[in-house]
């Protein structure tokens, strides 16, 4: 009985070791299949390989920069330019080199042979660098669109220099301020004096036909206007004396 038990245990152990040995290659090959599926998301739609210097069109398709540059260059140099000018290879929508959006990442420390061949091909055909992002092309306009105060500063730097510099507030600016204050006081005073002169000389429709208590109200309004006009005149005289 004991001998049969040891024989069965040894056979079962050998069977288990063989099963584990058979299953080990499957465990090692599973991540490679996942990596292949992940790399498929970044394949160029022209060469069907992993995108080198990837760029994305506004219609949402991924390409290698050398591939899409050659595609656009061949279209522009072809005879039938009017029929196929700047069309996306996938959806045939209009695209331009300036509208391409580059993608950046960590990159690969040891590029593969396909990447090396693409680089050599790009150098041989004198393919330029892929276009920079729109934020780097026009930094002043993009920053001004995000910050309106920066746009105002670029449009009127002299105003900001006078505003923030300690010596910017000169006598000319003080006289301009005094003139502005005087005119702000003069305009309502002139208007009130004109109304008073017009009502006293020509009268109004309400004064001739209205009831006595309305005439009393008009007299009170005239008195208050006279007092306000005297106050404004005093303020104007003080401004002239001070400035």
Curated annotation (Swiss-Prot):
EC number: 2.3.2.27
Summary of the tissues where the protein is detected: Ubiquitous. Highly expressed in roots.
Lineage: superkingdom: Eukaryota
GO molecular function, one term: ubiquitin protein ligase activity
Gene Ontology cellular-component annotations: endoplasmic reticulum; endoplasmic reticulum membrane
GO BP field: cellular response to hypoxia; protein ubiquitination; ubiquitin-dependent protein catabolic process
InterPro entries the UniProt entry points to: RNF5/RNF185-like, Znf_C3HC4_RING-type, Znf_RING, Znf_RING/FYVE/PHD, Znf_RING_CS
Keyword Metal-binding in record: yes
Leading EC class: transferase
Predominant location: endoplasmic reticulum
Protein location: Endoplasmic reticulum membrane
Region: Disordered, residue numbers: 110-135
Transmembrane segments: 223-243
Chain ranges of zinc fingers (RING-type): 44-92
Function: E3 ubiquitin-protein ligase.
Description of its domains: The RING-type zinc finger domain is required for E3 ligase activity.
Protein name: E3 ubiquitin-protein ligase RMA3
The gene coding this protein: RMA3
């Amino acid at each position: 009985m004991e001998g049969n038990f040891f024989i069965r245990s040894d056979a079962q152990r050998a069977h288990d070791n063989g099963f584990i040995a058979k299953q080990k290659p499957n465990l090692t090959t599973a991540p490679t299949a996942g990596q292949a599926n992940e790399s498929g998301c970044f394949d160029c739609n022209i060469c069907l390989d992993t995108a080198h210097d990837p760029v994305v069109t506004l219609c949402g398709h991924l390409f290698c920069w050398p591939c899409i540059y050659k595609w656009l260059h061949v279209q522009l140099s072809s005879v039938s330019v009017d029929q196929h000018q700047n069309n996306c290879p996938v959806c045939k929508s209009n695209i331009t080199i300036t509208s391409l959006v580059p993608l950046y990442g960590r990159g690969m420390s040891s590029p593969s042979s396909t990447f090396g061949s693409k680089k050599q091909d790009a150098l041989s055909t004198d393919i330029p660098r892929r276009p920079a992002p729109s934020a780097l092309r026009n930094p002043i306009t993009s920053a001004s669109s995000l910050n309106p105060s920066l746009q105002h500063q670029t449009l009127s730097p002299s105003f900001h220099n006078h505003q923030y510099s300690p010596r910017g507030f000169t006598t000319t600016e003080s006289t301009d301020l005094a003139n502005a204050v005087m005119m702000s006081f003069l305009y309502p005073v002139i208007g009130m004096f004109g109304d008073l002169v017009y009502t006293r000389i020509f009268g109004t429709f309400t004064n001739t036909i209205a009831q006595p208590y309305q005439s009393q109200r008009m007299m009170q309004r005239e008195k208050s206007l006279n007092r306000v006009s005297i106050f404004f005149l005093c303020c104007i005289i003080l401004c002239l004396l001070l400035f």
